Amino acid sequence: MLKEFREFAMKGNVVDLAVGVIIGGAFGAIVTSLVGDIIMPIIGAITGGLDFSNYFIPLAKSVTATNLADAKKQGAVLAYGSFLTLTLNFFIVAFVLFMVIRGMNKLKRRQEAAPAAPPKPSAEVELLTEIRDLLKKA
């Protein structure tokens, strides 16, 4: 049973999937940092120093806090600022994946478009061609 599991785990598709999941997780952390630490502060500076991560609508009358963390402790809130940040994060990931797949498709098309060299004629065909050429000369 251990041998069968080892064979299954070492198949190309399983290993490729594992590598993809690990790289995807690392890429997700990079994109999250890009959105939260670079893009959203720039957008906040353009819009007058607004911090989108703290935007919320209180859904309970007991919520009086001005920041999201305290507001969540006081009651139900609709944290639309966090949603905007995560939505931007999603679109960046989707765009990067689109560009990667687009590049891979272009490479595939180039490889498919390259015409294959015609196969070398067999020895019989070469011999018959020589005979034909000699008969034409005679």
Swiss-Prot record:
Listed GO MF terms: mechanosensitive monoatomic ion channel activity
Signal peptide (residue range): none
Described purpose of this protein according to its UniProt entry: Channel that opens in response to stretch forces in the membrane lipid bilayer. May participate in the regulation of osmotic pressure changes within the cell.
Subunit structure, as described in the record: Homopentamer.
Membrane-crossing segments per the record: 19-39, 40-60, 81-101
Compartment(s): Cell inner membrane
Protein name, UniProt field: Large-conductance mechanosensitive channel
Keyword Protein biosynthesis appears in the UniProt entry: no
Primary location group: membrane
NCBIfam families xref list: mscL, PRK00567.1-4, PRK13952.1
The UniProt record lists the keyword Transcription regulation: no
Membrane topology field: Multi-pass membrane protein
Family per record: Belongs to the MscL family.
Alphabetical UniProt keywords: Cell inner membrane, Cell membrane, Ion channel, Ion transport, Membrane, Transmembrane, Transmembrane helix, Transport
Gene Ontology CC entries for this record: plasma membrane
Domain of life: Bacteria
Lineage, highest ranks first: Bacteria, Pseudomonadati, Pseudomonadota, Alphaproteobacteria, Hyphomicrobiales
Gene: mscL
